Each structure stands twice: as C-alpha cells, then as structure tokens.
C-alpha cells in the first residue's frame, strides 16, 4: 500500500496491529530519505492520534515510547507536543502524558546544532508551564472532589503532577536550560510566574501537608532559577581577613586624599571575591583602623590616621550600606561588628592609651550620627565599653590630662574647614587684614596639620588648595601701595605659598594641580611646583629655562639682597622674585667661590632672603638641591653651606608677623626637599627640630643590601606575621619604585611558588593581593601579560604550577584581573600617578589583536579550524576560534588591559584544545574555577567576556568544570550567541 502521509501510516499501523519495532521498520521504508522525523512532526502526529478518545490509545502510545527510546524523535519535539494538550479533564490522557514525561524528564540531552539546543530550552519552558497548569487543574479538581466527598481520583493525579514537577526541577541541568529559556523568552517566564501564583492560591487551602510541602518545594526551585548564579557560601570558619586589613592600612597610610567611592568599590570587590560575611568584614575594617592608629608615628601621620578612622571610614560605611541590600540588615551587621570589637579589649585599651581618650566612644558617636547604628545600640555599646574601661591599665600620666585628644581636635577641625573655605571665597581686596588673622591662627601649633587632615579625609583638600592658589595669585603684585598693605600682601603671599608647598609634600602634588583647561593661564604656584620643586623621584635640571629669568630682574634682585639691610616689600612682584632667586643665588655663589664676597656678606644675604618672606628661601633651596646633584664631590661645599645658612636660625631682627610659625613650616619643607640629595652626597644638615619626625617613612631600606634580599626578607616576615603593617607597606612601595613593576611582581610570584603548605599559600595570596594594590593596574598587566604566559608556555616551569602553589597563583591572577578590570575605567590613585606609566603602544606591539597584524598566538589558534562551524547559524557571525563576547560588545582593544586579557584567554583556549595535559592544564582549570567562584555572572563588564566561545565546549570536557552552573557562569547570556553556546554545552552534558 502506498502511504500518502504520516497520519495514514499511523492509522495503517494501528489497523494492522503492528508491533513497535515492526512499525519503526515500516516507517523507515515509507519515508526512506530526506526530512528528519522532527521536521515531519512525528511526535505531534502520534500524540494527536493517541489522544482522540476519552482514554489514550495504548498501541499508538507504544509507538511514541519506542520512537523516544530509539531517538527517532527529539526530546524537544515530544515536550512541545505534550504542552499542546490542554483538556485536563481527561484523567487517563493526562496520566499517560505524565508517564511519557517520566521516561526522560530528568535526563534531557541534545547533541545537535546550537539552534536545536535552544529549541530544547524553549520546549522545556513550555513543558514546565504545562505541568503547572496541569497541577493547578488537578488541585482544583481535588478541592471540588473534597466538597463532593470523592477526593481519591484528584489526589492521585495531583501527586503525579507534583512528582513530575519535582523530578524535572531537581535536575540542575534542567534548571540551567530553563535559565537560558527565561532569557530567550521573557514573556513565557512571566506566564510561568502567574501560573505559580495561581497554584499557590489554590494549594493554600489544601489539607494534605505532604502535597503542600512538595508544592512549596517546587515553587522554591522555580523561583531560584533566575538567581541560580548569584548564590555563594560565605566563609564562616575564618575570623581574620588580611586583605581587608592591608587595603585599609594602605589607604590610611598612603592615600588619605583618595576618593571614597573607589575605596568602597575596592573593599566590595574583596568582600565578594573572598565571600566575607558583613559583620566580620566591618570588624576587620575597624581592627585595621585601630592598628593603624596605634602604630602611626607621632605628628602628621597620627593626625592623618585619626582623620581617616573617625571622618573617612564612617563615610565609607555609609556608601557600603547603599551597596548592601536592606538598611536594617546593615545596621544590625555594624552593631554585630562592634559587639565583636568590644571583645578585643587589649587592642582598644592600647588605642585609648595612644589617643589619650575613649576611642570607641567617639567612633560610636560618629556611627550614630551617620545612621549606621540606632541610638539604642550606641548607648548599649557605650555602656559595655565603659564597664570594660574600668579594668583597663591606667591611662596616660597626669601631665597629659589637660592635653586635648587628637580625635576631639580632628572632629572639631572638620566644620572649621568649611568655615575657612567660605572665608576664602570672600573678596581678598576688601579685608586682607581679617584674612591674615584667620591664616595666622591656622599656622599656630598643629592647627594647619589638623585642618589639612580633616580636609583630606572629607574630600575637601583639592578645593582648599585651589582657594590658596587663588589667594597666592592675587597677592603676587600690588600697585601704588603703602608699607602696611605691602607687608600684609607679603605675608598673605608667603603663608599661602608655604601652605601649598606643605600640602604638596604631605599629600602629593596631584592635589594642587588643576584640571587642564585649554587657553586658561596657569597660576604661578602651579608653574613653579611643576618645574622647580624637588619631589621624590623627580630630577630637576638646574639650567632649565625656568631657573633663568630676565637678567635685569636678576641683577636688581642681587643688588637688593646684597646692599639693603632688609628686603623691600612695597610694590614687590613676589612671583618674579621667586623665579629670579635661583639665578641670583648662582651669581652670589660664583662671587663667593671667586672670593668677591666674604662669608659675612653671604650671612647677610641669606638673612635677607629668609628674613621677611620664607618663600624666597624655599625657592632658593629648591634650585640649590638641583644644582648640588650636578656638582662633583669637591665642588659641593659652598652650595651645601648656603643651604645650611638658609635653614639655620636668623641672625638679624625680623619685623613681620607670624615669623616663628612660618619658619617652622619652612624648615619642614626644606628638610623634605633636601632629604634625597643629602643622602646621595652623604651630608648632614641639622634642621631646627620640632620634636616630631617630619619624615617617618623615609629611607627605610637597609644600606648595602641587595634589594632582592630585602624584598624576600620583608615578604617572609609579613607572611609569618599574617598581616602587613604600615612600615612594611612603605618598604614594598620603595622597592616597587626602585626595582620596577616586572622585577617586583616576578620576584614575589617566585616566593609564592616556593610555598608548599596549603594554608601558607592561601595567606600568601591574600597578602600579595593587598601588596599589589600599591599599583594594581601595572602589576596586573605584568602578571597576566608576561609572567603567566611565560609559566604556561615553558614546559620546564610546569612543575612549579602544581598544587598548592598553582592553585594559589590561579586565585591571585583572577583577583588581580577582576580588580583591575572593574576599576581601570576609574581614576588612577594619587600614589599610582607618581610612577612611570607604561606606554599603551608597548602593549599594542606586544599583543597585537587587529586584523592587519595578528599575533603569533592568534594565528596559531585560527589555524585550528576543526571547531570553526560549531555554531553554524546563518543569523550569527561566522564562528572563528577566537570570536568572543568582547568582540560582539565592541570593547576597545587599544586598551592594554583588554589586550592582555584577550590574549590570556586565547592562550587558555589553546591549552585546553591541545593534546598535551599536565600541570598547566590543571592550572587553567583552577583559573576558570576561581573566575566562576568570584563572578556574579560572566556577562558584559566581566573578564570572561574575553574568552573565545569555543573554549566553553573544551572546558566542559574537564570533569571538574562539567557542571551546568559553570557553563552559565562563564558564558555571556546577554548575547543570543552566548545563550546558544551555553545551551549547546549544557544539553550535551
């Protein structure tokens, strides 16, 4: 008999009562070649014929079961066919369909093209919706049956529905496929959510507790599908987190002026990467602050730490509160952190002793003001600490009882900063004497350092500096003035100049520099600071044009210094005097060296230079420092003698106000300026002492020891202690400056790879990450662009990648990559800008990624064309081995970090695809596992977007990576192509 269509063939089989295998053989004869059974809709046709009557046709159903078992039809076509049936009143038909689902719902798979795998996701979503509708209908019937007194039938069907639902949803693979389907078809997911709500309402009145709990479990599983990637277990067994500790110490010691937002982002990143519970995270921040306070050197550093702890950190926590979900929870976490902190009595007692007050009390008050703690919590915690303090060792001796604690002074200085900024906004020409009174008051004692620390911690230092630059600019020249206004103008110029120098030396010159505006005139102080002021790592040329002004001005200045009994003030152009002083000093030095001037004359000249306006002495020493560097050993004496004279006490009478206060600041500026050159020339100059070390972290390296030894030594000490202290941070920073990023990073990684104990390697990673925060961007480029590729491509080094150091290095690499990638669009911090930045062009030639000049690695990978058509979809771009989500998102490949990441993932892809296995393949697995562990989702904005799509199919061949969650995490599901790749990989698991 000639069969015309599928329906006829099925009917003939039924009439002639063919067995299932007979039916399959005959079907293949009727439809020999051409279209597949899915295209002919075989599953649909069989179900349609089987479900005609009130009960299903068992023979035709047996054909369908045979077709499923022998894979004549795909799972997706069967699920789609089932989900079309909607007459839930036909119990036997519904039960037959549930039985068919039971055959395969927990072992779905698809080994076809990507489109077929996406089809399976969609079919599963439809089937889930059908199951929910079916369950709701069964529950409704059960309710009606209970009312009529015949519950048994409805209960049996409801139990079957819930069983199939549970079986389908308990498979992680199925939930992953549904996750993809949800992104493909948002409207269908909305329908599922509605069905779930409806089902919940019906089941709420159900008396059977077993069925109700089963239904609730299914509901929970469905609701977990959209968030199945963001669940991470927190580390409850650890109590110390050295990375958080070190990041706080680093910021407090070296970056008080840094933006609060960038610190918040960095801390949030660490919290997420290390899965730290919030109370322990906040506790670690407070612990680090107290340690910083206790070990900070007396003077400016102590004030900086106080401002950081009591002004900046509460602001950081306020921002962290916005990041965390739920205000109430965060205040509870902060309260919990304080409860833990109060148990660290020795730490708090030591801090109280150092600060001469109850530190915790002040801290609690600040947190209360910022809304981080409720009033009740503040009072409760204060009472607990008060009770503890009664048993504390005796506070500082009686002589200190009248000294106000720094914390109180800093908290009082903060509103004063705002008032001073308002005062500085007024018209300077109207009441210069009043302004001078305010500034004079700022110079007394430690007022200036207090105000600067408060301004730095609250982000106001830049506007503070800007106001002083404007004042300095305003006072450079005054016309037709009498003696009184001239002396006020000289004082305002001098005080603003000294303050700005002090700010630049204490907080970095970046605070002073304005945003570059085209066409705008650069203020005098900025020009002088950039071209003439000595700083760490800045070499000045004493013959630079900036030191060689108009010769007539120089001659008149030399005459003025040499002949007058004191400096004239009226109509003096102070900026010109400051720029001419260097050339004048050169003339005077030459005259002295040639015997034209005697030492007494030099003494009179230096007294004239510093007698009225200390700024001139600062400018003179700035040039002398540059000049001394260029002289031979036997030529330096007179220049150094002149620096001594300028830094020494004044021999004549001074006549201008606030002289002693100005000299104190001048001497601290001169001491910092001369530090480098005095060390290089092995000279000593005694600067008048203020009783406080003005440069506590300077010259920390031991003399005559190779820097590699110093690096390994200090790292070993830090590792043994388990945390980084402020002094070590400064030593690491000096070594980074001295040895360069590659040397620094390479040697520390060698130290990490020497570790053989697991707990040591993990501690080393936490500490290294925080040390690398000194210049995370550059370190990451070196680590991912040079060191890792070197280890992965050289078989003689593979042994060093064994576990545990290999696992640790993978963790460190991922942490660095994530931190740099999340922050590299932001601003480089003050301390990082000082370093030489590596040219972008270096990275473009090292890692070419354009079509014109493909790198060796790109060519090597592109030649592997076996996988080229893995996703032969006409709608998507052709699939080359290197195509990644970043290319579809058109990420800027001129950026060095993007290039390095893209190349690293190409290398990973080639290692996974190669036939040689070893520690390097194991390392790649650890690297990817860590990526998955740290990431919320491998979408746009994540480092995994640089991974070629073809890597996914290679990765799932590695046993540890062959899980649906891993596939979802490493693919960019925001892209259709990403979803296809994920569906194909998961469906094949």
Curated annotation (Swiss-Prot):
GO molecular function, a single term: transcription coactivator activity
Phosphoserine modified-residue sites: 862, 873
Localization: Nucleus
Motif (LXXLL motif 5): 788-792
Motif placement: LXXLL motif 1: 128-132
Function: Component of the Mediator complex, a coactivator involved in the regulated transcription of nearly all RNA polymerase II-dependent genes. Mediator functions as a bridge to convey information from gene-specific regulatory proteins to the basal RNA polymerase II transcription machinery. Mediator is recruited to promoters by direct interactions with regulatory proteins and serves as a scaffold for the assembly of a functional preinitiation complex with RNA polymerase II and the general transcription factors.
Oligomer status and interactors: Component of the Mediator complex, which is composed of MED1, MED4, MED6, MED7, MED8, MED9, MED10, MED11, MED12, MED13, MED13L, MED14, MED15, MED16, MED17, MED18, MED19, MED20, MED21, MED22, MED23, MED24, MED25, MED26, MED27, MED29, MED30, MED31, CCNC, CDK8 and CDC2L6/CDK11. The MED12, MED13, CCNC and CDK8 subunits form a distinct module termed the CDK8 module. Mediator containing the CDK8 module is less active than Mediator lacking this module in supporting transcriptional activation.
Protein name: Mediator of RNA polymerase II transcription subunit 24
Species this chain originates from: Homo sapiens
């Amino acid at each position: 008999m000639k069969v015309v269509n599928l329906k006829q063939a099925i009917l003939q089989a039924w009439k002639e009562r063919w067995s299932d295998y007979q039916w399959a053989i005959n079907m293949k004869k009727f439809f020999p070649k051409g279209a597949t059974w899915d295209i002919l809709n075989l599953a649909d046709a069989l179900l349609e014929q089987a479900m005609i009557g009130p009960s299903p046709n068992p023979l035709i159903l047996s054909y369908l079961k045979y077709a499923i078992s022998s894979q004549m039809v795909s799972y997706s076509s069967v699920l789609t066919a089932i989900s079309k049936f909607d007459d839930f009143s036909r119990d036997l038909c519904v039960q037959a369909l549930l039985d068919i689902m039971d055959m395969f719902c927990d072992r779905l798979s698809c080994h076809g093209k990507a489109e077929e795998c996406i089809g399976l996701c969609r079919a599963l979503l439809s089937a889930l919706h059908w199951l929910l509708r079916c369950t709701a209908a069964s529950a409704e019937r059960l309710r009606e049956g209970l009312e009529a007194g015949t519950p048994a039938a409805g209960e049996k069907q409801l139990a079957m529905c819930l069983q199939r639902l549970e079986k389908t949803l308990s498979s992680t693979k199925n939930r992953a496929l549904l996750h993809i389907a949800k992104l493909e078809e948002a409207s269908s997911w909305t329908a599922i959510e509605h069905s779930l709500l409806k089902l919940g309402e019906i089941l709420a009145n159900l008396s059977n507790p077993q069925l109700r709990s089963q239904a609730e479990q299914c509901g929970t599983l469905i609701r977990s599908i959209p968030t199945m990637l963001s669940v991470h277990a927190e580390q409850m067994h650890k109590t110390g987190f050295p990375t958080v500790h070190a990041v706080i110490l680093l910021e407090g010691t070296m970056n008080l002026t840094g933006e609060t937002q960038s610190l918040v982002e960095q801390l949030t990143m660490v919290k997420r990467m290390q899965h730290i519970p919030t109370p322990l995270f906040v506790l670690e921040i407070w612990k680090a602050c107290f340690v910083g306070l206790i070990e900070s050197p007396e003077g400016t550093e102590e004030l900086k730490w106080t401002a950081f702890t009591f002004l900046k950190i509460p602001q950081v926590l306020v921002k962290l509160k916005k990041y965390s979900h739920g205000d109430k929870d965060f205040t509870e976490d902060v309260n919990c952190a304080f409860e833990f902190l109060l148990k660290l009595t020795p730490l708090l007692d030591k801090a109280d002793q150092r600060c001469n007050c109850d530190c915790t009390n002040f801290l609690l008050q600040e947190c209360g003001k910022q809304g981080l703690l409720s009033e009740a919590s503040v009072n409760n915690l204060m009472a607990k600490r008060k009770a503890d303090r009664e048993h504390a060792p005796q506070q500082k001796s009686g002589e200190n009882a009248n000294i106000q604690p720094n914390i109180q002074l800093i908290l009082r200085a903060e509103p004063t900063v705002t008032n001073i900024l308002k005062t500085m906004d007024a018209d300077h020409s109207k009441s210069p004497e009043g302004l001078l009174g305010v500034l004079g008051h700022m110079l007394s004692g430690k007022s200036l350092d207090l105000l600067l620390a408060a301004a730095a911690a609250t982000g106001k230092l830049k506007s503070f500096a800007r106001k002083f630059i404007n004042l300095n600019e305003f006072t450079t020249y005054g016309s037709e003035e009498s003696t009184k206004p001239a002396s006020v103008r000289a004082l305002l110029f001098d005080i603003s100049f000294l303050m700005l120098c002090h700010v630049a030396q204490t907080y970095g010159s970046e605070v002073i520099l304005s945003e570059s505006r085209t066409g705008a005139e650069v203020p005098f102080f900025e020009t002088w600071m950039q071209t003439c002021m000595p700083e760490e790592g800045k070499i000045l040329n004493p013959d630079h044009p900036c030191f060689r002004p108009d010769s007539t001005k120089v001659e008149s200045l030399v005459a003025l210094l040499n002949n007058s009994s004191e400096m004239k003030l009226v109509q003096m152009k102070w900026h010109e005097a400051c720029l001419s002083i260097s050339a004048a000093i050169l003339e005077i030095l030459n005259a002295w060296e040639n015997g034209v001037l005697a030492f007494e004359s030099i003494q009179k000249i230096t007294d004239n230079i510093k007698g009225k306006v200390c700024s001139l002495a600062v400018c003179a020493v700035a040039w002398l420092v540059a000049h001394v560097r260029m002289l031979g050993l036997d030529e330096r004496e007179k220049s150094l003698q002149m620096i001594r004279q300028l830094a020494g006490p004044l021999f004549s009478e001074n006549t201008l106000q606030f002289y002693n206060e100005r000299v104190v600041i001048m001497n601290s500026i001169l001491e910092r300026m001369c530090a480098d050159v005095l060390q290089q020339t092995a000279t000593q100059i005694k600067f008048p002492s203020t009783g406080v070390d003005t440069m506590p972290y300077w010259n920390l390296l031991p003399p005559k020891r190779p820097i590699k030894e110093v690096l390994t030594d200090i790292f070993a000490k830090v590792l043994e202690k388990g945390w980084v202290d402020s002094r070590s941070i400064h030593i690491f920073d000096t070594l980074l400056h001295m040895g360069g990023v590659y040397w620094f990073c390479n040697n520390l990684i060698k130290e990490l790879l020497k570790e053989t104990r697991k707990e040591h390697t993990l501690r080393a990673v936490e500490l290294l990450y925080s040390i690398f925060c000194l210049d995370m961007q550059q370190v990451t480029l070196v680590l991912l662009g040079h060191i890792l590729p070197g280890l992965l491509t050289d078989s003689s080094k593979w042994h060093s990648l064994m576990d545990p150091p290999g696992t640790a290095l993978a963790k460190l690499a991922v942490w660095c990559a994530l931190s740099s990638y999340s922050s590299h669009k932001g601003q480089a911090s003050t301390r990082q800008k000082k370093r030489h930045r590596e040219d972008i062009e270096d990275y473009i030639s090292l890692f070419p990624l354009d079509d014109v000049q493909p790198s060796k690695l790109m060519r090597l990978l592109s030649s592997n064309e076996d996988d080229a058509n893995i996703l032969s979809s006409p709608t998507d771009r052709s699939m080359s081995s290197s195509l990644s989500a970043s290319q579809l998102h058109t990420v800027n490949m001129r950026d060095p970090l993007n290039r390095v990441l893209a190349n690293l993932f190409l290398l990973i892809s080639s290692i996974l695809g190669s036939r040689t296995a070893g520690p390097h393949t194991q390392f790649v697995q650890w690297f990817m596992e860590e990526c998955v562990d740290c990431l919320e989702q491998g979408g746009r904005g994540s480092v995994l977007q640089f991974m070629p799509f073809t890597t996914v199919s290679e990765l799932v061949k590695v046993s540890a990576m062959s899980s649906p969650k891993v596939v979802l995490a490493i693919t960019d599901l925001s892209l259709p192509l990403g979803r296809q790749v994920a569906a194909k990989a998961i469906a094949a698991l």
